[in-house]
Amino acid sequence: MHAEEIIRSIEAEHFKETLPTIYVGDTVRVGVQIREGNKERTQPYEGTVIAKRHGGINETITVRRIFQGVGVERVFLIHSPRITNIKVVRRGKVRRAKLYYLRDRVGKATRVKQRFDREL
């Protein structure tokens, strides 16, 4: 067995099969497993997907939201065991693969139009 085949077989064990189709511009709610002391809980993080990076097991999404007037971005490894669930709240209609321009916008200018032709 070659090294590439070994890596692919290990990655296949950790792949999550039941993920929704996520597009840039979508508003998603990501459930993140958090440890506080000796307790574990799921913390929801809701925001707009501004970037998506493909790469098999290393696939990531960058989610941006405004919290107390400050823009907060988090990068999530989609296949990470810390991600308990991902739910698409609404579909967004955009013409770009990366929405980094939203970082410079304030208030209502950061809104993304809703798209109705794709299923949630």
UniProtKB/Swiss-Prot annotation:
**Ribonucleoprotein as UniProt keyword:** yes
Which terms under GO biological process does the entry name? translation
Protein keywords = Ribonucleoprotein, Ribosomal protein
Q: Which GO terms describe its cellular component?
A: cytosolic large ribosomal subunit
Record InterPro entries: Ribosomal_bL19, Ribosomal_bL19_CS, Ribosomal_bL19_sf, Translation_prot_SH3-like_sf
Keyword Repeat included in the entry's annotation: no
Q: Which GO terms describe its molecular function?
A: structural constituent of ribosome
Coiled-coil positions are none
What HAMAP family has UniProt attached to this entry? Ribosomal_bL19 (MF_00402)
PANTHER family recorded: LARGE RIBOSOMAL SUBUNIT PROTEIN BL19M (PTHR15680:SF9), RIBOSOMAL PROTEIN L19 (PTHR15680)
Family assignment from sequence similarity: Belongs to the bacterial ribosomal protein bL19 family.
What this chain does, per the entry, is described as: This protein is located at the 30S-50S ribosomal subunit interface and may play a role in the structure and function of the aminoacyl-tRNA binding site.
Q: What is this protein called?
A: Large ribosomal subunit protein bL19
